[in-house]
Every structure is written in C-alpha cells, then in structure tokens.
C-alpha cells in the first residue's frame, strides 16, 4: 500500500480518543498528541479553543458572579473537573434545579466558556444513553455540561435514571 511504501517519509502523529489527561499531557492543549475522534463529535471538539484573554473573561463574568450562585457553582465544578483524576478523587454530578428564568442555562454557558465556545460545548441532553456515554467518553477529564435534563428522563423509558448517572460517573 501507499502507506507501507512511504513509512520512512510519512510523519508519525500520536493520537488519543479522548480529551483531558493522558499521562502528563492535557489534550487538546498538547502539541505532541492529537485527538482522533473529531468525526464523532466535530462541533464539540472544534468548540474547545481559546479566544481572548483571561483578563477579558474575568471582566465579563465578574458582575455575573456577584448575582448568581448557580454561576459560581457551575464554574467551580467546571474547573474542578480536570483536577479529579490528578487528585485520585471520585467523579461528581452537579444538577441545578430551579424554575425557568433562574439562570441555569446562562450559568452553563458561562462555565462552558472556560473551555471554549459555549454554544457548541454545552450539550442538549436530549439524546440516547449510548450517545451520551460516547460524548462523556470523549470529554474524559473535561466536564459534560448538559442542558434541559428533563428531556432525558422521557428518552430513557424503562431505564433507571440513577443507573444512567452511575454509568456516566463510573465510566
């Protein structure tokens, strides 16, 4: 084949199937290793990038922090998620509960902005359990930020909701 005949001149690229920690590397911010699951979740993978400066981000969210406990909790959880593996801690789930207009979706979008484009990073949870597990597997160390949790309860008819949460946090 073409690849076999050209092994000496083709560049070798190390790749991995998930984001987050791999040994001492943190994907996608490591230049030595690339992610090879771009086809499974292209919008999600492309959403993870930097834009602007930390100072600009802090200036934008600081007023929101003062007025929303949801925002503070979700951003803290979002930042903590990448420390779980390094601290040998157990994964956790943060479920925001409140009426419409309480700021839950805004909090998710601001937390997603820690990692990149919040519109494409935040997931609708209106998907099959298998699709949700695939997204969680790709994110690995990064947080799974899902909106509209009530939509999944109707999609897992016959399946225990607690079992799904257990699968997400164990796998």
Where do the language-model regions lie?
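Conserved catalytic/switch belt of AAA+ P-loop NTPases
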Residues: 161-171
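Conserved glycine-centered beta->alpha loop in an early N-terminal alpha/beta scaffold
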Residues: 1-65, 134, 139, 156
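P-loop NTPase catalytic core of nucleic-acid-dependent motor ATPases
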Residues: 33-120
């Amino acid at each position: 084949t073409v690849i076999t005949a050209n092994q000496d001149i083709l560049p070798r690229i190390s790749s991995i199937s998930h984001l987050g920690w791999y040994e001492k590397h943190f994907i996608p911010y490591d230049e030595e290793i690339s992610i090879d699951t771009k086809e499974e979740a292209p919008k999600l993978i492309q959403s993870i990038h930097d834009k602007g400066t930390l100072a600009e981000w802090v200036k934008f969210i600081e007023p929101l922090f003062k007025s929303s406990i949801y925002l503070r909790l979700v951003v803290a959880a979002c930042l903590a998620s990448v420390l779980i593996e390094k601290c040998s801690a157990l994964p956790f789930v943060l479920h925001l509960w409140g009426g419409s207009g309480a700021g839950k979706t805004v909090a998710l979008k601001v937390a997603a902005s820690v990692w990149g484009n919040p519109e494409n990073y935040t997931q609708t949870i209106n998907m099959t359990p298998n699709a949700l597990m695939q997204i969680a597997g790709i994110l690995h160390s990064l947080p799974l930020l899902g909106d509209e949790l009530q939509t999944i309860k109707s999609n897992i008819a016959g399946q225990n909701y607690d079992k799904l949460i257990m699968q997400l946090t164990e796998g």
